Amino acid sequence: MKLSDTDIRRYMAEGRIAIDPVPGEDAIGAMSVDLQLGDSFRVFVPGKVSHVDLAPPGGIKGRDIEALMGHVEVGENEAFYLHPGEFALGITIQRVRLPADVAGRLDGRSSLARLGLMVHATAHTIDPGWDGRITLEFFNCGPLPLAMRPGMRICAISFEALMSPTSKPYAASPTAKYKDQLAPLPSRLASDQSA
């Protein structure tokens, strides 16, 4: 069952859902909360490799992915430019904490999509028990460069109450790849390949 604005306010007041910094009333929609763009990005550095092997036996190594991506910090009153056909990772300003009986769903804003910006390419579900800032997967599928500025409203998170708490809350898992993230982290696909 999706949570309404009334439910979201109640869950936040009870401390069941935490968003830090706390959103203003103008950020709470009928069934979602707007999140803002942070100042940290990761971009692929061209020319490092000819391709990325996603599966064994050639499988990608974690340190190899780190080497493929550069880290970009955007200062106050500056913009991050995403050119047509480019992909980048970004992060929300807000840290989000969910209980074991609530999942989140992240969606881009329609107004930005109409300009060619995909805000979250895949993996829209935020697992129950999540605690951290949220990495965004940007792609510019439009014809013009897009200037994104820290602090702008970039996406919305909605919440769904589970019928019962999960036995595997994300932050409690010793193998959770992205728990407590505070910056956009590159893929940790390599940690999947032992399974």
UniProtKB/Swiss-Prot annotation:
Binding partners and assembly: Homotrimer.
Protein name per UniProt: dCTP deaminase
Signal peptide: none
GO biological process: dUMP biosynthetic process; dUTP biosynthetic process; nucleobase-containing small molecule interconversion
Keyword set, alphabetical order: Hydrolase, Nucleotide metabolism, Nucleotide-binding
Name of a matching Pfam family: DCD
Top-level taxon in the UniProt lineage: Bacteria
Catalysed reactions, semicolon-separated: dCTP + H2O + H(+) = dUTP + NH4(+)
Gene Ontology molecular-function annotations: dCTP deaminase activity; nucleotide binding
NCBIfam families: dCTP_deam
Organism taxonomic ancestry: Bacteria, Pseudomonadati, Pseudomonadota, Alphaproteobacteria, Rhodospirillales
Job description of the protein: Catalyzes the deamination of dCTP to dUTP.
Species this protein is from: Rhodospirillum rubrum (strain ATCC 11170 / ATH 1.1.1 / DSM 467 / LMG 4362 / NCIMB 8255 / S1)
Gene3D superfamilies: 2.70.40.10
Positions that bind dCTP: 109-114, 127, 135-137, 170, 177, 181
Entry EC number(s): 3.5.4.13
